[in-house]
Amino acid sequence: MPYIKPKLANIIHPVIMFKLTQGYEPAMEPSQLYAVTRGQWKMDVNRSKQFKYALACDAGLVVEVYEIETWHQSNETMSEAELLYRRAKGLHAGETGRIEFVGKIAPEEIRKKYNKTNVVKYWGRSQTPFKYISPENL
């Protein structure tokens, strides 16, 4: 199968990109990918509420797009199965001072725009596991 270079993302919506390092596996179940992406992050909850979409990213490529519905303090909304999975993968689980979102797969037109796109230019040299992208600030 020939290599197809992913198109470059053109972000026009307020998004938070999440760098999935620990716990991410390309063949994981959708529910596991959601659990890894949605929490638990050391972020400012008030700032995070300004962003509508979450981009789950691996190696500079968007692997899934979620529509963020609400933000919560860590451990408020995760199921026991999600917490067990996160602990088994060595991820933060139930720590204070962290937040998590509740959301769903983004609408198809949004997924089509961002899923499987290259977002390396937006990360720059940042080492943080998440990045806020406001189109008006680009």
Model-derived regions, located:
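Short beta-strand element of the conserved SAM-dependent methyltransferase core
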Residues: 18, 66, 99-105
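A short pocket-lining beta-strand/turn micro-motif at the edge of beta-sheets
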Residues: 50, 62-64, 97-99
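Short beta-strand-centered aromatic/proline hotspots
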Residues: 63-71
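Short, solvent-exposed secondary-structure boundary/capping segments
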Residues: 73-104
